[in-house]
Amino acid sequence: VAEIFDVPVVFAKKTQTKNIAGDVYTTKVESFTHGRVYDIIVSKEFLGEGDRVLLIDDFLANGKALEGLAKLVKDSGAELVGAGVVIEKGFQPGGDFLRKQTHLESLAIVDAMDEKTGEITFRE
């Protein structure tokens, strides 16, 4: 996505690594998929006032991960301009919740999954 828009990429990390030095922004993020809470970290060197941020994630279920990242963006003084996800689980509340907060685009929205047959119903 960043390559298409010709903008920099900033990764939010679940653990402090040696390439994240100095002051950081941090927030707690609940992962529906993994059933646990993570501390998400972004170096203050890469995010701050005047930045415009588009959040990108692979899956959207209950919206807690993107909600936590949006809080981190707000805490930094940057502006959240929208969010994009690859797959949204439309049968869970995350998409509706986030659309009340910011512009959200999903490449695919799964409206139903049949556990017995494995059939997936996509939103049109």
Regions found by a protein language model. Give the residues of each.
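Short, glycine/charge-rich flexible loops or terminal/linker lids adjacent to PRPP-binding catalytic cores
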Residues: 7-53, 119-122
